[in-house]
Amino acid sequence: MTDHIAAVKTYLLDLQDRICAALEAEDGKARFAEDAWERPAGGGGRTRVIGDGALIEKGGVNFSHVFGDSLPPSASAHRPELAGRGFQALGVSLVIHPENPHVPTSHANVRFFCAEKEGEEPVWWFGGGFDLTPYYAHEEDCVHWHRVARDACAPFGADVYPRYKEWCDRYFHLKHRNEPRGIGGLFFDDLNQWDFDTCFAFIRAIGDAYIDAYLPIVQRRKHTPFDERQREFQAYRRGRYVEFNLVFDRGTLFGLQSGGRTESILMSLPPQVRWGYDWKPEPGSEEARLTEYFLADRDWLAGQP
């Protein structure tokens, strides 16, 4: 798998560079700061963070490549056949929290995992996806986001987008709140149903689609005026983001349990959050419409070309 791992690593480093350049250009003020780090147990990465910009209040685009002699519990719990295997995990993960409540938070991740044991076939798979978390949502933005997702999946089969869209809706769900984190997108894991080259081509299609999905929405919304009440609602909804990442997110749990770099793992958390006891939006308000209409499992592309 050595050549395969090298090819994936080269792609992921380039993807990180391209996404950072596009986001810096869109912000126009802030620049990413890079923190290269090493993991004592094996591997390391490039954490890049940005904040206090004209657009981005806090964000990060991380690359990591970690390896070790045995898997953490979060990885082997649902794959007991991997126990006793050495592993390599590579990925790019990003979260962008804009200051303007009219610009959604976005998250994307593409990753590769390989577990090897002498004398046995390697076990490998890809995972990833991207999802959108609006605060003041617009239907045209939701349609655009999902159209880009569908088009990225299309060359790999007509069933791919619906399957991974549904998986995303199911995965990014706060069970204790019985509500989705956002309006979804794509999510997939354990991808090895095709040969390596096809799976790798698919992961590249998804990684490359993120900027095409996100920047047009940013450009439409970043100059929309907002007030303090809307910022407070954004902070309240960001609380849901924190709850999901710390309680349910498999990537967060894997990173913490595998001795990953805590600062990089928790980079996804927003800078300002608030919780209010049993707070509910005014009936009929924009805030109420978010949960009543947008945060529902729906086919955003029904009737769309």
From Swiss-Prot:
Where does this protein hold substrate? S93, N109, V110, R111, G259, G260, R261
GO CC annotations, alphabetized = cytoplasm
Biochemical pathway: Porphyrin-containing compound metabolism; protoporphyrin-IX biosynthesis; protoporphyrinogen-IX from coproporphyrinogen-III (O2 route): step 1/1
Give the cofactors, semicolon-separated.
Answer: a divalent metal cation
What EC designation does it have? 1.3.3.3
Q: Where in the cell is it found?
A: Cytoplasm
Q: Which UniProt keywords apply?
A: Cytoplasm, Heme biosynthesis, Metal-binding, Oxidoreductase, Porphyrin biosynthesis
**What InterPro entries would the database entry show?**
Coprogen_oxidase_aer (IPR001260), Coprogen_oxidase_aer_sf (IPR036406), Coprogen_oxidase_CS (IPR018375)
Active-site residues, Swiss-Prot/TrEMBL: H107
A GO MF label: protein homodimerization activity
Entry keyword Metal-binding: yes
**Cystine crosslinks:** none
GO biological process terms, semicolon-separated = protoporphyrinogen IX biosynthetic process
- Per UniProt, where does a divalent metal cation bind? H97, H107, H146, H176
Which residues does the annotated region (Important for dimerization) include?
Answer: 241-276
Reactions catalysed, as given in the entry:
coproporphyrinogen III + O2 + 2 H(+) = protoporphyrinogen IX + 2 CO2 + 2 H2O
Task: Report the top EC class in one word.
Answer: oxidoreductase
Q: Where is this site: Important for dimerization?
A: H176
Subunit note: Homodimer.
Name the protein family: Belongs to the aerobic coproporphyrinogen-III oxidase family.
What is the role of the protein in this entry?
A: Involved in the heme biosynthesis. Catalyzes the aerobic oxidative decarboxylation of propionate groups of rings A and B of coproporphyrinogen-III to yield the vinyl groups in protoporphyrinogen-IX.
Entry-linked NCBIfam families = PRK05330.1
Instruction: Give the matching HAMAP family.
Output: Coprogen_oxidas
Q: What name does UniProt use for this protein?
A: Oxygen-dependent coproporphyrinogen-III oxidase
Give the organism, scientific name: Pseudomonas aeruginosa (strain LESB58)
